[in-house]
Amino acid sequence: MTLKAEIQAIVDAIGARRRFVVSSHARPDGDAIGSEMAVAFALRAMGKEVEVVNADRAPAPIMQFPGVPDIRIAPTVDGAFDAALIMECSDLARTGVSGLDAFFVVNIDHHPGNTGYGELRWFEPSAAACGEMVFDLITALGVPLSREIATHIYLAILTDTGSFHFSSISPRTFEICKATLEAGVDPVLVARNVFDSNSMGRLKLFAAVLGAMQIASSGRVSLLYFDDPMARAAGGTYDDTDGLINLPLTVKEIQAVVFFKHVAGDEYRVSLRSKGDVDIGAIAKIFGGGGHKNAAGCTARGALQGLREMFVEKIERAIDGRSADR
């Protein structure tokens, strides 16, 4: 199907149905929340019944945005729906919400590694954020761009482009942002809510994690580590680590960051970020994860030092333009 046909099929499916559940990936970020909330507001404007259900709460700064406190946090869907719209989620299991597959599933995503689940699928890997796709969908639905819808689209784009730092941005990105500002978005207020709403515990946790930062011998890769005892000592939480990974990239020489977050035993959630042409999405894929060229993640098991060395070796190869799949 062409892009136009994919959007039209989704528009037709929405028009033929009344009750919708909307969800995204577990531990949702700004693009996940912004995309699903923009869609929810648009569907309600059409007179549809909508419930947004996520496995986890949004990060504290994003809780300030319209409708986000009303998202139902639950491990399973409770209700009868005509369709499930899954936004910005590469695999249905990653929602962390069971029962979604009982409905007509529409899969809208920009992750290259999407597994292709659902009855209708629309992938746009070139989109800088799923929020860009949501803008096109809402335009196709003929729903006016309200301030609430526009704010969530702008939130999605702002956060998933690393504040317009990532190479995924395009002229289209700024055309959409222009439209959201014309609809009443205050970009300064959005930025302040996202980036200037730190608690003291979060600031202390940043200090603890950065204080323990390691730098690979080449000086090009930063290694971060987090566990629950660090959070308790700082008076912070797991969610307070959101955004921390981007700070080492502000150092000119640093080309990539690996952030190990301890889960239990020898299991770690690994977040990856990079600059320019360093494709850490391919590295995440080696470990069963995925994401984008400059932002990705995976889960890894093993001794921490061994994992550090393994990731550094693969990232160094990627920086040098060699294959990391060795």
Kindly label every feature range from the protein language model:
Residues 2-9, 87-88, 138-140:
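Short, motif-level signal for alpha-helix interfacial/capping segments enriched in acidic residues
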Residues 1-8, 93-102, 126-134:
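An acidic intrinsically disordered interaction segment
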Residues 23, 27, 86, 107-108, ...:
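Generic enzyme active-site microenvironment
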Residues 34, 64-66, 117-118, 135:
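Short acidic, glycine/serine/threonine-rich loops at helix termini
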Residues 66-68, 74-120:
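Active-site cofactor/cluster-binding pocket
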